[in-house]
């Protein structure tokens, strides 16, 4: 409600909440910091896990920042921005989601201290933007070039990514799988490599142990052979991929045919059989002994395929058909009549196997496959899910290095280097922006401090030791949470792609700047029916944070 010449002017509908100026900033900063605080304890190899239970009683146990925030039903708009930080980090770099969110939260905490000193938000925003830009330059300077063919480097990065997750005991084994999978699907484009992660399929089955997880250089499909009379194992497979149904098509037009004699009915049935037989004969004629069909297969067609000793699988997903094409070299054919021997793919073995009591089709021994499958095993559903998340992160990290060819030391080392260098840079800039750049530098120390805290170490003492050692020995010194001492992270093999800290700082600073720009929050009241039966809503999103 506003007032004009003493008269109240109603602009917004009844029930609308409004927060202006410092109230709006305080509310948004607090909401964002609560999100950062939620995931902070999961950071690093000694981080804890979160158990999330939804309204249906489904349970997720994880320490993956992006998964935690994705599973939470977050209402506050500023808090939702922090969720976007994690999602962007996950999409662009694959790892460092918790790091990005924690840095964003700390940047806002430091900004609040400056706001309390009456520093204008515009000055803080300018200082943060300068610091973020300088941080990108510094990271490029300290990044080490590596040979993307060096499997040992790739494996160390994958191990670093997996450490601290549920699959930690088998991290060496899982890291090998991640490296091999990425190397297999990487394609050289000019002087660099490109990796399309859509070509790596993750298939999960409960049962066995994590050690039973395996990489199949080919494709695993959660389907079974359509007819009991078909072979369950085909060596030297010639594979046809068909994305039409092996059935008699119904006409587009609605037509009725009057049958006046049994002979006419018999003629119809014989013609139907002839059409199906021609389809199957064509498959046999081109030399295919395995056929994957995206749609259905008629019972009669199944019978003839079985009679000819051809293995057939129906209703295969489009994404699986594309992976089969990349793995075997086959071409997906729309019309069976157009099938030629050149359209067939090859695999040493196609076999139906029982995995955890269910039938699955394994297509293995493909020549230089550009699609692979990681079959994930584990004792419980929660273990299998967490192993999948760990492997997805590891695969993305290896992909980053293969594409960029640059790494940095992990374990808080880059953040400490940035903090030291940004402090020096702040003095060059001068003015009130200097205060914001110094605050940015101080905020980055939250990463080594949190790593130490989560490992049960004294955060202040550890940070002082690490900064002193870092200044003396160079930018690769970080926090060894296992020994509780400063250590050369590069020598210890604790490394990450440079893309991870670069994206984390970029996402965190952009989110902090966006939240600092807001000086007015207007929240409409929810509809009555939503209030009665729904979740807690946006009409009172500030109440829990006041």
UniProtKB/Swiss-Prot annotation:
Molecular chaperone; binds unfolded polypeptides in vitro, and has a weak ATPase activity. The keyword ATP-binding applies. Keywords: ATP-binding, Chaperone, Nucleotide-binding. The gene is thsB. Pfam families: Cpn60_TCP1. GO terms for molecular function: ATP binding; ATP hydrolysis activity; ATP-dependent protein folding chaperone; unfolded protein binding. It comes from the Archaea. Belongs to the TCP-1 chaperonin family. The keyword DNA repair does not apply. Forms a Heterooligomeric complex of two stacked eight-membered rings. This is Thermosome subunit beta. InterPro entries: Chaperone_TCP-1 (IPR017998), Chaperonin_TCP-1_CS (IPR002194), Cpn60/GroEL/TCP-1 (IPR002423), GroEL-like_apical_dom_sf (IPR027409), GROEL-like_equatorial_sf (IPR027413), TCP-1-like_intermed_sf (IPR027410), TCP-1_chaperonin (IPR053374), thermosome_alpha (IPR054827). It comes from Thermococcus kodakarensis (strain ATCC BAA-918 / JCM 12380 / KOD1) (Pyrococcus kodakaraensis (strain KOD1)). GO terms for biological process: protein folding.
């Amino acid at each position: 409600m506003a007032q004009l010449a003493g008269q109240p002017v109603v602009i917004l509908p009844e029930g609308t909440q409004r927060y202006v100026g410092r109230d709006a900033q305080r509310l948004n900063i607090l909401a964002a910091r609560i999100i950062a605080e939620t995931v902070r304890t999961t950071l690093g190899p000694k981080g804890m896990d979160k158990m999330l239970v939804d309204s249906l009683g489904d349970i997720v146990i994880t320490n993956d920042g992006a998964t935690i925030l994705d599973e939470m039903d977050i209402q506050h708009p500023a808090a939702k921005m922090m969720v976007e930080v994690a999602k962007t980090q996950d999409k662009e770099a694959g790892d460092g989601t918790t790091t990005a969110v924690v840095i964003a939260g700390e940047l806002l905490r430091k900004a609040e201290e400056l706001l309390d000193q009456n520093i204008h938000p515009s000055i803080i925003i300018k200082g943060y933007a300068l610091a973020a830009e300088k941080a990108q330059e510094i990271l490029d300077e300290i990044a080490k070039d590596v040979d993307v063919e060096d499997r040992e480097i790739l494996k160390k990065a994958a191990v670093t990514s997996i450490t601290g997750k549920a699959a930690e005991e088998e991290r060496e084994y899982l890291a090998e799988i991640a490296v091999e999978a990425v190397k297999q699907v990487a394609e050289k484009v000019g002087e660099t490599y490109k990796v399309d992660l859509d070509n790596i399929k993750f298939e999960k089955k409960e049962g066995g142990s994590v050690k039973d997880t395996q990489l199949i250089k080919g494709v695993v499909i959660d389907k079974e052979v359509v007819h009991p009379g078909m072979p369950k194992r085909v060596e030297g497979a010639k594979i046809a991929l068909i994305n039409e149904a092996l059935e008699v098509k119904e006409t587009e037009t609605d037509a009725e045919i009057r049958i006046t004699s049994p002979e006419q009915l018999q003629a119809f049935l014989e013609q139907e059989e002839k059409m199906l037989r021609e389809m199957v004969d064509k498959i046999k004629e081109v030399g295919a002994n395995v056929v994957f069909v995206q749609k259905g297969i008629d019972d009669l067609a199944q019978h003839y395929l079985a009679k000819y000793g051809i293995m057939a699988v129906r209703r295969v997903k489009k994404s699986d058909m594309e992976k089969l094409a990349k793995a075997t070299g086959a071409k997906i054919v729309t019309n069976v009549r157009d099938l030629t021997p050149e359209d067939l793919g090859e695999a040493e073995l196609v076999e139906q196997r029982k995995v955890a009591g269910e039938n699955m089709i394994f297509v293995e021994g493909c020549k230089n496959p550009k699609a692979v499958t990681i079959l994930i095993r584990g004792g419980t559903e929660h273990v299998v899910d967490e192993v999948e998340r760990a492997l997805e992160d590891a695969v993305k990290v290896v992909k980053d290095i293969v594409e960029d060819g640059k790494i940095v030391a992990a374990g808080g080392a880059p953040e400490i280097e940035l903090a030291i260098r940004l402090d020096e840079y702040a003095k060059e800039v001068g003015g009130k922006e200097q205060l914001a750049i110094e605050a940015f530098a101080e905020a980055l120390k939250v990463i080594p401090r949190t790593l130490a805290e989560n490992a049960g170490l004294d955060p202040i003492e550890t940070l002082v030791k690490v900064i002193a050692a870092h200044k003396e020995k160079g930018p690769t010194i970080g926090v060894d949470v296992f020994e509780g001492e400063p250590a050369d992270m590069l020598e210890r093999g604790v490394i990450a792609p440079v893309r991870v800290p670069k994206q984390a700082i970029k996402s965190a600073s952009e989110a902090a700047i966006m939240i600092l720009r807001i000086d007015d929050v207007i929240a409409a009241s929810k509809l009555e029916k939503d209030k009665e039966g729904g979740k807690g809503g946006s009409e009172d999103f500030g109440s829990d944070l006041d």
